[in-house]
Design a protein with these regions (language model features):
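Short, compact, well-ordered microdomains
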Residues: 57-81
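N-terminal non-globular leader segments, chiefly Sec-dependent signal peptides
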Residues: 1-63
Length: 81
């Protein structure tokens, strides 16, 4: 399992879920492991949001970016800052 504790930003997603879209651009922690759900947690002074996806199918890295595809076909792009 890979855990990124800070300064990880959700850059983009193919998800159209109304609960996911507001998380784009937010900084949080990322827990990622192939064959397990992706977990992205963000915290603001007012609330904490947790994104938990379906099972991760593929993980890719390019520079400071992480590309994730779930078994349902949804894609997520994260960036270290």
């Amino acid at each position: 399992m890979m855990r990124i504790n800070s300064s990880c930003v959700l850059q983009s997603t193919t998800s159209l879920n109304a609960r996911v879209l507001p998380l784009i651009g937010r900084v949080g922690t990322l827990e990622l492991s192939s064959g397990q759900p992706l977990v992205f947690k963000t915290t603001t002074p007012k609330q904490q949001d947790v994104l938990r996806t379906s099972t991760v199918k593929a993980i890719g890295f390019a520079g400071s970016r992480i590309f994730v595809k779930t078994e349902r076909g949804t894609q997520y792009t994260f960036e270290f800052q």
